[in-house]
Amino acid sequence: MLGGVEVEGIAGMPLLLPLRPYRTLEEAVSGLGGKVVRAASRDVPLVVVGDGREDADRAFAVRTTFDGWAGGIVPVRAQGLRLAERQEFILSGVLSGAVAVAEAFQHLRGGNPAAGRRNVGLSLWRPEADWREPQTVGPVITRLPSALWLIGIGNVGQAYMWALGLLPYENPNEVQLVLQDYDMLAPSNDSTSLLTQPTVIGARKTRAIADWAEKRGFRTAIIERRFASDFRVGADDPAVALCGVDNALARSALEDAGFSRVIEAGLGYGIRDYLGFRTHVFPGSRRAHDIWRTEESGREVRTDLPAYQALEATGADQCGLTKLAGRTVGAPFVGAVAAAVVVGELLRMVNGGHAYELIDGHLRNLDHRTVVRAAEGQPFNPGSTEAERAAKRDRRSTATEFQPYACVGATPLALVPNGG
C-alpha cells in the first residue's frame, strides 16, 4: 500500500503483544510506519476488526474473524458469517490480517472481481477442512518451541521471525534461535520483508534480525555462510529447521544437514503466481532432492514481458534477466500467510498433533488448495517451553475494551475502535 497505513481511535489503548520498545498500541503503530489519525480517509477500502462501525457502503469492506486456529475475512455486508472469536491464537490473527491485505491488494490491482466479495480463510489446525466448521478450531496451546534453526532471513524468513516473536512465551529467554544467511539487507527488502526498515539497510540480515529477536527476549546465534549440501549440524544444535530460501540447490539439500525435521515454504514467482505459497515437511514421502529437481526443470521463465524487455533495452544482459525473471515475487502478505502455515505446523508438532507434508495454496482463490497429510512417524520431541497463560495476559489489559475497525487502500489502512 504505497499510501501507507492510517489508524484511527487508538489513543490510550494498551499494547498486549511483546513488541519492544513500544508500550502502547499508538507507539507501536507509529514505530512500525503507520499513521495515527483522528479520522481515516473515506476513499479507501475498509477492513473491520472486531465490533467497530461498519461503513458498509464502500466498494471494498471486509471483516477479519477468527476462532482458535481458524482465521480469515468475510464481507461486512454478509451478516452472521463471523466466527465465534472466543479462543485466542496469535497465528490466526496473523493469517486473517494477511488475508485481508491480500484481498485489498487484489481489489486495487484489478483482475480479480471476487476480491472483497467472498469469504476467505483457512484453519491452521485442519487446513484440508472448511475453516468455518467447528472442528477446525483446534486446541488451546500450552507448549511453544524452544530451539529452532532458521535458514534464510529474507521475505519468508523474516515472516517466520515475526510470527515467532508474537507467540505468548512465558519465558522467552529459554528460546534458542540459530539464524543462517550470508546476505545483506538491500533497499528492496524494505518493501518485501516484515522486519526490514530503512535504518538497517546495508546490515547483515543475520545481525539485524538477531538484534530484533534479542529485544523480544530470545537467545540467538548466527551463521553467515551459504546453506549447501556439505553443511552439517551437531548433536547439540536445534533439531528443527524452518527454511525460507529461494534457491533450488539449497532446498534440495535440506535433508542432508542432519535435522530431525525441516519445515519449509516457498512463494510463487512471476505476475501469475505471486500470490501462491507451498509448504513441505521433511522427511516425507518425497525426497527434497527429487522435488526441486522436478520443479526447477518445469519452471517457465518469461523474459519476453515488457518490464524485462525494458531492462534489456537499457543494457541488462540476457543471463541476468533470466535469473531475475525466475525469482519469486516478494509480497509480504503472502510471506505472512506462509509463515502462519509453517509456524502452525511447528506448533502442532510441539504439542503432539498431526502433520501435513504438503500444503499448496493460492490467495487468488484459497478454496482451491492441495493438502497432503503426513504418514504417522516416530515420536519426536523438538524441545519446548511453557506458553503464557491467558489469565496472565488478561491481567495486563485495562478496562478499555478494544473493538476496532480498519481501512486498507491504495492510499492508507486505518484502525478504529467501537464508537471511535
Q: Which role does the model predict for each range below?
A:
Residues M1-W162, L166-E174, V233-G420:
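Glycine-rich phosphate/adenylate-binding loop
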Residues L2-K35, E174-F218:
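Glycine-rich phosphate-binding loop and adjoining beta1-alpha1-beta2 segment
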Residues T220-I222:
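Hydrophobic/aromatic anchor residues within beta-strands of the central parallel beta-sheet
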Residues E224-F231:
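Conserved SAM/SAH-binding loop
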